[in-house]
Each structure stands twice: as C-alpha cells, then as structure tokens.
UniProtKB/Swiss-Prot annotation:
Residues given in the record as [4Fe-4S] cluster binding sites: 99, 133
HAMAP family cross-referenced by the UniProt entry: NifH
Gene (UniProt): nifH2
Origin species: Azorhizobium caulinodans (strain ATCC 43989 / DSM 5975 / JCM 20966 / LMG 6465 / NBRC 14845 / NCIMB 13405 / ORS 571)
Binding site for ATP: 11-18
One Pfam short name: Fer4_NifH
Gene Ontology BP, a term: nitrogen fixation
A molecular function GO annotation: ATP binding
Its biological purpose: The key enzymatic reactions in nitrogen fixation are catalyzed by the nitrogenase complex, which has 2 components: the iron protein and the molybdenum-iron protein.
InterPro entries for this protein: NifH/chlL_CS, NifH/frxC, Nitrogenase_Fe_NifH, P-loop_NTPase
PTM-bearing positions, type ADP-ribosylarginine: 102
Description of post-translational modifications: The reversible ADP-ribosylation of Arg-102 inactivates the nitrogenase reductase and regulates nitrogenase activity.
Full protein name: Nitrogenase iron protein 2
CDD domains named among the record's database cross-references: NifH
Length: 296
C-alpha cells in the first residue's frame, strides 16, 4: 500500500476551488488512486460533482439528528461516488450562529477515530480560504494537510487571498510538516493572467502547478452535477484536469515554506505588468472618466 498523501485545496470563495479540486481528484481516481474527500466549506458543495447530488448530508447535521457525533456510524456520513471516491462533508451551523470551523474539527476527529483513512492513497480537504479563523485553518494547524494547493486567478482579490493563505502556511510550517505545493490558476481571462500567476508563484517561492483554461464545458458538466472527467472524458478540458492531476501526483515531497509578500509588493507586481499604470497617489479613487479628463 502506498503512503497516504494528505492534500488540501484552499482558495478565495467563488474562485472555482471545489470544481477544480473535484475534477483533479476524479482524474487521480481514474489513474487508479484511492481517494477520500473531506469537504470543509460551509456550502457543503465539495462532493456534489462526484456524487451527482445537490448537497451531501453533513456530519454536523447528522450528529444533530442523532443526538451527538458519538452516535454516528462511518457508513452514515460517508458516501461513495464516481470511481469509488469516498465523500464526507463536515458542514457547519446555521448562518449567524456559531463557528462554522467547528464542523471541520469535529469531522476530522470523527473520521480518524473511525478508520476512514485506512486503505486510502489521497485524502483531500476542500477548504474555504478567505476566512482565516482557526477552524478553517485546522487542517494546516493540526498538521493534517501536508500539501496545500491554492486555487487562484489573475484577479486582485484572488491573489490577495492566495498571499494570505501563504501567511497561514508560513505560521504553522515550522511547528508541523505543512508545505505549499503550488498555485493553480483557474483562468478568468483577465489581463496578463498567466504572467501574473507565474510572477506571484515566484514571489511566494513556489511554482505555478497548472494554468487551467476557461471553458464553458465546465459549466455544462456542473449543471449536470458531474465533473468534466466523467461528463466529457474525451474533451480538451478533461485532459487539462488530467495534466493537473499528474502534476499534483508527481509533486509529492516537493512543497516549500512560502515567502508571503506585502500589499505594497502585490500592487507593485500589478504595476510591473501594466495592470496598474502608475504609483501616482493622486489617481487613487478616481473614476475612468476622471482619469481620462486629466490626461486629455
């Protein structure tokens, strides 16, 4: 049996993290690897494309119905999906009441105690990355996830979130074994996106693992609650996800301790690539029309 690889996909909300991770994991399963997905996002959408389901019952919701987590059996919380991928969603409380990160902590403890990680090649944590509270940092803080892959794009806030996640990895890297595996750029077709992604990776001391091109077939597959790997296995996009999976598979043990940058350095990078045209503070807060009038 191969040694267990514990990876995590982090990223800004809405960046396509869950879609990217599920397609990557479907490709890994297609390669013959045994996969467990632990969804750590309150939306509980980390497994929907693998299970063809709107949302999986979460550990916290099932525990509430049963009385406590101790009253649950592993078979009740774990569902089997595409290519025998095992799926679990941690869940969280109602919006506005309590800490959603509590579900992450409760779930991982329950899974470990009940042998969920046995006979598995990969366990993948799909984590909301622009929330930096301790609960969501749990896979990093408790040395559960060894390799972190950050899904980002060429958008300012996606890069900002990637840098913030890198700060979290740096904080716990010395006390545990967590490392940054690399960045995955989920294309949004912004200006000079590939250049920016490669530059940010370089500044963080890591690599751009893969640049995933934008393709409407991803949305077509999602509407049918399927990964592209399953929905259109012969498509160009499916092969992109297979290439990404291959890169992740071959990246074991190659993670690094990141070197996060400051907000000023991030803005400087945008200026270097012509996204922000000048450092002139007088232009801050000016509309496009106002700037055009000034330059006329």
């Amino acid at each position: 049996m191969s040694s267990l690889r514990q990876i995590a996909f982090y990223g800004k909300g809405g960046i396509g993290k869950s879609t990217t991770s599920q397609n990557t994991l479907a490709a890994l399963a297609e390669m013959g690897h045994r996969i467990l997905i632990v969804g750590c996002d309150p939306k509980a959408d980390s497994t929907r494309l693998i299970l063809h389901a709107k949302a999986q019952d979460t550990i916290l919701s099932l525990a509430a119905a049963a009385g406590s987590v101790e009253d649950l059996e592993l078979e009740e919380v774990m569902k089997i999906g595409y290519r025998d991928i095992r799926c679990v969603e941690s869940g969280g409380p109602e919006p506005g009441v309590g800490c959603a990160g509590r579900g992450v902590i409760t779930s991982i403890n329950f899974l470990e105690e009940n042998g969920a990680y046995e006979d598995i090649d990969y366990v993948s944590y799909d984590v909301l990355g622009d929330v930096v509270c301790g609960g969501f940092a749990m896979p990093i803080r408790e040395n559960k996830a060894q390799e972190i892959y950050i899904v980002m794009s060429g958008e300012m806030m996606a890069m900002y979130a990637a840098n913030n996640i890198s700060k979290g990895i740096l904080k716990y890297a010395n006390s545990g074994g967590v490392r940054l595996g690399g960045l995955v750029c989920n294309e949004r077709q912004t200006d000079k996106e590939l250049e920016l992604a490669e530059n940010l990776a370089k500044k963080l001391g890591t690599q751009l693992i893969y640049f995933v091109p934008r393709d409407n077939i991803v949305q077509h597959a999602e509407l049918r609650r399927m990964t592209v790997i399953e929905y259109a296995p012969d498509s160009v996009q499916a092969n992109h996800y297979r290439n990404l999976a291959e890169r992740v598979h071959n990246n074991g043990g190659k993670g690094i301790i990141p070197t996060p940058i400051t907000m000023d350095e991030l803005e400087d990078m945008l200026m270097e690539h012509g996204i922000m045209k000048t450092v002139d503070e007088s232009q801050v807060g000016k509309t496009a029309a106002e700037l055009a009038a000034l330059s006329a």
